[in-house]
C-alpha cells in the first residue's frame, strides 16, 4: 500500500501536527500526515479562540516564520482584540475569537494545497525502530509505512480517559476514541511517561440565553490582524462576546456535587493546568470569593453553539445544569453537551533535545501536549519547530534552535527541555526575561529572515518584509530629523499636562515623553503628508513609534541578552563526563547528567544547578 519512503511522517493532525506537516512540506520534504479522523484537522477542542497574553506573540512568531496559524485565524475570525493596550508594548497581545468549524475547514484546505503533503486516516500504535533510530510507523491495521523522520503530535489522545462525575470512558475528546499502543511502545524503548489532565466547559444553545442580562464584550473599534502577510485583511464586521458572573447560590449547588467529583474523589490522578482551573477547583481554592467571571463566546458566525469560558468542569451533568441555570442570563439554558475532564499520557520533555528530537531515539520528534504543554498556540509553535528540524536533520543541515532573546518560541522550548514540567505548561509574558525584545509588532523583523533562509518563507513574502522594513526605517529617520516648533507641539502637550516646549526640537525627543503618542502628531501637516505619501500602514507606524519611544529600554535589554549569549556560545560536549568534576554539588551533577545541557547558559537555568556549579563549569570549559 505504501511502497515509497517518506521524508517525514507526522502522527496527529491537531495544531502541532498541522504546523509540523506544513513546515516539512513547505521545505520540499515528502510528508505524510496521519490522523484518526481527516474531518477533524486542527480542531478547536476547547475554546474557539486564538492568541491572548503571550500566546498572541507566539502566533505572530509562527506567522513570521511561514506557519499558517495566523493566516487561518485571520480568515476565520469573528472578533479581534489587542489585549493589554493600557500597558507597554511588550505586553500587547493579539487575541481573536474564531469560527470553530471554518477554522478546521480552512486548515484542511490550506494543507491540501501543498503538493508534497499526503494524508492517511488511521491510528498509529507502533514505531518501526532499528538501532535506536526510527524508520517508520505501524498502524492499528498492521500497515507499515517507512520514513526518515517521525513527528509525534498526539495531543490528549494517548490512553485518553474522559470523566463526567463518577462516569468515565475512553476517548481523546468528545466523540472520538483514544489512541492505544504508542505509549506502551515508547515506554518499552526506555521513555518515562506521566499523566496530565485538562477539562472543558459545557456548550449551550444561544437561543436559550438572555443576553440582556449580560455585559457585552465587543471587539476593538479598529481591529488589527495576526498575519504579517497581505493575504488577509482586518475584520470589517465583528460578533460580540458576553460576560456574566457566578454567585454564592451557584457555588452552593456546585458543592452538592463534590462527593461525585472525579477530581476531589481521587479518581483523576493527572495534574491539571494551574492557570485554567475548573469551576469546582476555583470555588474550593478561593472560598472567600462570592463570584467568578464567565465569558460567553460564540462558536462561529452561523451556529447556535456557545462556549461557556470560565466554567470548565467534570462534575455530574445534572449538577452542571442546575448550577449554570442559576447564572444571570442562563435561567432557561439548554445544554448541547456537558463539560468533562480528560486524562492523557505525556512524556516529560527533559527527554528531548532543543530541536524536539528525542535523546533516546534518533529522528523521532515530539510536539504539543505530548510534551506537557497546554494551548493551541504552544502546540503549534512546537509543531513548526519539530517539522523544520526533522527536515534539517535529514538534509544534514544545522538545526534551528531559537534563543530566549529571539522568540517566545525559544523561551517555550528552552523551559520545557531545561526545566521540564509537572503540570500543563502555558506561556506568559513573565516567563520571558527579554519581553521588550520579543514584542508582537516586531516578530517578522526577528524571524522572517530565518524562515526565508531555511525555506518556510517564500521569496514573495520575504521581499514584502524587506520593503516594509525599509519603509519603517525611513520613517524613523524622518521623525529623528524632523524639527517641530512650540506653536505646533504645545497644544498637544497641554492635553497631557506635559511641560511646554520653550524652543524648537526634534519630534523624536518630544515623542519620548510619557502619554504622548505618534497619533497626536498626525494632525501636523508635515507628518500627515509623509504618512500619506508613503502609504504607511498602522502596523508600520506602530513599529516606528515603539522603536523611537522605547529605544533606551530596548538597547538595555539587548545588552543584557548579549551578556547571556556569551555563556550561550560556550558549548558542552554531548557526552561530557560530569563525574570527573569532583567540585560539582551532588544535586547539580545529577541534574546535569539527566538534562545534558548543550551550553553553559542552558546549564545555568536548570533547577538544582547552583551558581557555584556554573562557576566550576566555566573554569573547566575555559581550560
Features from the language model and the residues they span:
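Core beta-strand elements of the Rossmann-like FAD/NAD(P) dinucleotide-binding domain
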Residues: 4-6, 140-149
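Extended, charge-enriched "interface" segments that sit outside catalytic cores
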Residues: 431, 437, 448-615, 619-623
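Conserved N-terminal/central alpha/beta ligand/cofactor-binding core
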Residues: 22-126, 141, 153-173, 177-183, ...
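A glycine-rich dinucleotide-binding beta-alpha-beta segment and adjacent secondary-structure elements
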Residues: 307-373, 401-414, 537-591, 596
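Short hydrophobic core segments
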Residues: 11, 144-155
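An anion/pyrophosphate-binding glycine-rich loop and adjacent beta-alpha core
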Residues: 37, 55, 183-321, 329, ...
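Conserved beta-strand-loop-beta-strand element in the redox core of flavoprotein oxidoreductases
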Residues: 128-144
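Beta1/beta-strand and adjacent pyrophosphate-binding region of the FAD-binding site
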Residues: 2-16
Amino acid at each position: 500500500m505504501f511502497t515509497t519512503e517518506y521524508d517525514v511522517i507526522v502522527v496527529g493532525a491537531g495544531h502541532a501536527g498541522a504546523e509540523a506537516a506544513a513546515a516539512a512540506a513547505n521545505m520540499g520534504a515528502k510528508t505524510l500526515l496521519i490522523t484518526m479522523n481527516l474531518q477533524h484537522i486542527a480542531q478547536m477542542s476547547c475554546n474557539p479562540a486564538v492568541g491572548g497574553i503571550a500566546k498572541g506573540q507566539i502566533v505572530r512568531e509562527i506567522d513570521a516564520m511561514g506557519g499558517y496559524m495566523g493566516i487561518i485565524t485571520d480568515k476565520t475570525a469573528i472578533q479581534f482584540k489587542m489585549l493589554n493596550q493600557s500597558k507597554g508594548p511588550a505586553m500587547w497581545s493579539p487575541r481573536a475569537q474564531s469560527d470553530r468549524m471554518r477554522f478546521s475547514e480552512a486548515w484542511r484546505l490550506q494543507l491540501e494545497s501543498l503538493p508534497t503533503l499526503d494524508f492517511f486516516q488511521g491510528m498509529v500504535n507502533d514505531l518501526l525502530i532499528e538501532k535506536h533510530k526510527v524508520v517508520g510507523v505501524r498502524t492499528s491495521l498492521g500497515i507499515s509505512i517507512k520514513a526518515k523522520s517521525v513527528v509525534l503530535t498526539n495531543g490528549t489522545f494517548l490512553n485518553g480517559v474522559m470523566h463526567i462525575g463518577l462516569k468515565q470512558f475512553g476517548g481523546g475528546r468528545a466523540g472520538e476514541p483514544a489512541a492505544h499502543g504508542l505509549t506502551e511502545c515508547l515506554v518499552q524503548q526506555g521513555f518515562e511517561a506521566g499523566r496530565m489532565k485538562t477539562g472543558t466547559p459545557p456548550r449551550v444553545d444561544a437561543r436559550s440565553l438572555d443576553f440582556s442580562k449580560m455585559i457585552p464584550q465587543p471587539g476593538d473599534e479598529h481591529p488589527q490582524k495576526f498575519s504579517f502577510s497581505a493575504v488577509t485583511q482586518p475584520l470589517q464586521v465583528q460578533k460580540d462576546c458576553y460576560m456574566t458572573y457566578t454567585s454564592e447560590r451557584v457555588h452552593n449547588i456546585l458543592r452538592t456535587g463534590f462527593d461525585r467529583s472525579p477530581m476531589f474523589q481521587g479518581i483523576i490522578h493527572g495534574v491539571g493546568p494551574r492557570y485554567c482551573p475548573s469551576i469546582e477547583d476555583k470555588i474550593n481554592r478561593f472560598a472567600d470569593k462570592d463570584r467568578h467571571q464567565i465569558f460567553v463566546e460564540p462558536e462561529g458566525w452561523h451556529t447556535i453553539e456557545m462556549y461557556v469560558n470560565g466554567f470548565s468542569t467534570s462534575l455530574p451533568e445534572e449538577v452542571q445544569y442546575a448550577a449554570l441555570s442559576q447564572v444571570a442570563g442562563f435561567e432557561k439554558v439548554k445544554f448541547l453537551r456537558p463539560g468533562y475532564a480528560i486524562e492523557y499520557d505525556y512524556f516529560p520533555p527533559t527527554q528531548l533535545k532543543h530541536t524536539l528530537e528525542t535523546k533516546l531515539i534518533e529522528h523521532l520528534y515530539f510536539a504539543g501536549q505530548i510534551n506537557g504543554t497546554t494551548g493551541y498556540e504552544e502546540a503549534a509553535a512546537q509543531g513548526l519547530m519539530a517539522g523544520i528540524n526533522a527536515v534539517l536533520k535529514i538534509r544534514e543541515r544545522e538545526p534551528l534552535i531559537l534563543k530566549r532573546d529571539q522568540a517566545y518560541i525559544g523561551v517555550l522550548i528552552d523551559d520545557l527541555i531545561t526545566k521540564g514540567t509537572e503540570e500543563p505548561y502555558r506561556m506568559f509574558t513573565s516567563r520571558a526575561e527579554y519581553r521588550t525584545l520579543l514584542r508582537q509588532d516586531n516578530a517578522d523583523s526577528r524571524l522572517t529572515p530565518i524562515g526565508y533562509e531555511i525555506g518556510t518563507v517564500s521569496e514573495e513574502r520575504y521581499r514584502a518584509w524587506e520593503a516594509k522594513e525599509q519603509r519603517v526605517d525611513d520613517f524613523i529617520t524622518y521623525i529623528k530629523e524632523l524639527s517641530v516648533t512650540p506653536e505646533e507641539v504645545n497644544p498637544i502637550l497641554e492635553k497631557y499636562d506635559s511641560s511646554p516646549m520653550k524652543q524648537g526640537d526634534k519630534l523624536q525627543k518630544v515623542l519620548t515623553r510619557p502619554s504622548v503618542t505618534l497619533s497626536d502628531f498626525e494632525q501636523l501637516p508635515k507628518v500627515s503628508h509623509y504618512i500619506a505619501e508613503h502609504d504607511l500602514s498602522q502596523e508600520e507606524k506602530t513599529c516606528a513609534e515603539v522603536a523611537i519611544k522605547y529605544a533606551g529600554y530596548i538597547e538595555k535589554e539587548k545588552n543584557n541578552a548579549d551578556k547571556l549569549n556569551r555563556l550561550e556560545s560556550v558549548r558542552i560536549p554531548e557526552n561530557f563526563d560530569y563525574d570527573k568534576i569532583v567540585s560539582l554539588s551532588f544535586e547539580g551533577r545529577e541534574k546535569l547528567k539527566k538534562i545534558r545541557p548543550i551550553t553553559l547558559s542552558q546549564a545555568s537555568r536548570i533547577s538544582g544547578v547552583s551558581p557555584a556549579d556554573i562557576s566550576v563549569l566555566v573554569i573547566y570549559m575555559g581550560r
